[in-house]
Amino acid sequence: MSDPSETQPELSKLKLGRKTVLVTGGAGFIGSHLIMLVAVRYPLWRIVNVDSLDYCSSLKNLKCLENTRTYTFIQGDICDRYFINHLFASENIDIVFHCAAQSHVENSFLYPSEFMHVNADGTNVLLQAAFEAGVEKFIYMSTDEVYGDSLDKEFDELSPKRPTNPYSTSKAAAENLVMSYWEKHKFPIIITRSSNVYGPRQYHEKVIPKFLLLLQQDQKCTIQGTGLQSRHFLYVEDITEALLMLMERGALGEIYNIGANFEIPIIQLARELVKVVKNASNDQLDDWLLFVEDRPVSDLRYPMVSDKMHRLGWKPKVSWKDGIRRTIKWYAENTSYWPVVTEKKQHRHLLTENHHLLHDAKTKDTFAQSAL
């Protein structure tokens, strides 16, 4: 693999002139934070946000950019080849951040074909269109879960992929598609594998907002299995900073681990949140825990080394103490941001809410109307 320092001339070239950046899944959690950072860091660049407005996305995530002239929202499906081809033909995209994905692991066991369709087939549609359009960089967001788990050995970018659930399998398949364009065409791709990301505005199917929502409703934190499985947690601002750094100076054709310094067992995570949210004593912590049936397959750990990112100059800046404080505060102040609905109804409810918000969003009339 190439030395990241070899891409320094490319950094200068990238910063010349205005660019048009496409973010797929931009109304979702990480995508919306990324768009906001790009808008601040590169105020003259155009940002095109393509999102299908699935249940875990919301136009509220980017309400602050509604009246920004350089920002365009377009509703559409990345699996729709006609839509994507038309998008690249009409929008003059320079850089792609592919964040769109089905990512809820439990759902992947129920709907494995849907996960493979969106995460792998959708990526292939994007790759073909981006390649034909000659974009400058295609940055694909993958996951540490493609490695499978490990109790002791830390994974680096050369470690073999051993995905253990339909979600991580679909992401590994998409990675292979992305890398094949580099191997065959030298198409300028970069792949990232990140730890669990958390922070404000994350939908409550993920563990931290899920626990916070349950505690706000005076319900117990539901823990799958023993709760001894641990995760590394990375604050959302740190992942978006890493993505921009890779856009600016990442080596083409490379994979980058974006790992967190902080690891915690899920049972301990729940206890920490109970202590803060419910102001509980140590003797009361476990009264707020409810152990439920585990996933069909549950990985214990995803330990990664991020030396390649560190050599580029990136390291996490937001400590766990500060990040979780900000996150708890946001959810306490935004209790009705995400509607509280049962799992079976969440898709329909969120899509209905997004439909109403869509009428207020700023869209590009010449293109968006045909995409809706």
Predicted features by range, described:
Residues M1-V197, E237, R326, A332-L372:
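N-terminal Rossmann-like NAD(P)+-binding domain of SDR-like oxidoreductases, especially those catalyzing
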Residues D149-L151, P200-Q202, K206, K308:
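Short beta-loop-alpha junction of Rossmann-like oxidoreductase domains
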Residues I139, L151, K186, Q202, ...:
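Proline-centered turn/helix-capping motifs that create local helix->coil transitions or kinks
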Residues A173, L177, Y181, F211, ...:
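Hydrophobic alpha-helix immediately C-terminal to the catalytic Tyr-X-X-X-Lys motif of short-chain
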Residues S2-E6, K13-L14, G76, L215-L372:
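C-terminal substrate-binding subdomain of Rossmann-fold SDR/epimerase-dehydratase oxidoreductases
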Residues V38, Y181, K210-L214, A242-L246:
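A short, amphipathic alpha-helix embedded in the catalytic core of nucleotide-handling enzymes
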Residues F83, E114, D121, Y203, ...:
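Residue-level recognition of oxygen-bearing side chains
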Residues P112, T192, H204-E205, G250:
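Active-site loop immediately N-terminal to the catalytic Tyr-X3-Lys motif
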